[in-house]
Amino acid sequence: VCIYGGIMEYDKKNGFTKIKSEPDFHLVIANSNIKHSTESVVAGVKQFKEENETEFSKLCNDESELVEDVLKLLSVNNIKELGQKIIQNQEYLETIGVSNEKLRDMIQVGQKSSFGAKITGAGGGGCIFSLTDESNLEHSINQFRDKNYECFSVKIDFKGLDTF
């Protein structure tokens, strides 16, 4: 992504595909400062899958549909609906058990001040992100800082690597 810029989609079958869209949004990244083990989070998800095969299968199908919806929303720069899909994805992550109380609190702060917020990465700790635009960027940052959460904003670079 750093080389090509923009947004990439990945799936096991096709690998990486660049999304031909340049939506105009910011992400506010907030850090829980909770150290976590990806290995133990993955083991927990595996256990959830083994104990809840039907539910896990349904979640995987629902997630595939959600990805298709997100790709469409990105192509038309529909940030508000994209935020709703982010919230929906976070609900799936809650179901499989990769969240905790601090992450839930951070997500709640993010969802109140942005279009949507969710865990990024494996879960269990680390960071969350909130989807914002210019209208709610500073408010979202201030809400996280008011709760003493470290945060910063990022915007997607659509240009990628450039020679000098």
What are these regions (language model features)?
Residues V1-K118, F129-F164:
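C-terminal nucleotide
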Residues G126:
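Conserved glycine-rich beta-strand-loop-beta hairpin in the small C-terminal domain of fold type I
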